[in-house]
Amino acid sequence: MSDVLDRLAELLEQRKSADPQSSYVAKLYAKGTDAILKKIGEEATEAIIAAKDGDAEQIVYETADLWFHSLVMLANAGLGPQDVLRELARREGLSGLEEKASRPVE
C-alpha cells in the first residue's frame, strides 16, 4: 500500500514546479495553503455525508479524495506520507490515553 502513497508523493512533488495551467495540483499549489485547506474541508464534509448515507462505494470514493488532498497539504508543507506512517507506527500499541499523555503540553 505504501508503494501507491510513495508514487503519489513523488508525483505531488513534481507538480510543485508544473505549470498551473497544465495540472490541477499545480493550480492548487499556486493558489496557496488556504485553497488546499479549503479543499480538504470540502472533501471531509463529502466523506462524512457519504458515511452518514451508508453508501460504501461513496465512502471509499470520498475518502480517496480526502486522502489525496491531505497528501497535497503534506507536500505543500514539505512533508510526505512516510512522516504520517512513522507517527502511526510510533503510536501503535499505545492506548489512546497513553498517546494523549505523551503529547507535549501547549
Swiss-Prot record:
Q: Which gene encodes it?
A: hisE
- Chief place of localization: cytoplasm
> Listed GO cellular component terms?
cytoplasm
Q: Which UniProt keywords apply?
A: Amino-acid biosynthesis, ATP-binding, Cytoplasm, Histidine biosynthesis, Hydrolase, Nucleotide-binding
Q: Which reaction does it catalyse?
A: 1-(5-phospho-beta-D-ribosyl)-ATP + H2O = 1-(5-phospho-beta-D-ribosyl)-5'-AMP + diphosphate + H(+)
Disulfide linkages recorded for this protein, renumbered to the chain, are: none
InterPro entries from the xrefs?
HisE, PRib-ATP_PPHydrolase-like
Q: Does the keyword Glycoprotein apply?
A: no
Supply the name of the protein: Phosphoribosyl-ATP pyrophosphatase
* Biological pathway: Amino-acid biosynthesis; L-histidine biosynthesis; L-histidine from 5-phospho-alpha-D-ribose 1-diphosphate: step 2/9
**What does the UniProt entry say about where the protein is found?**
Cytoplasm
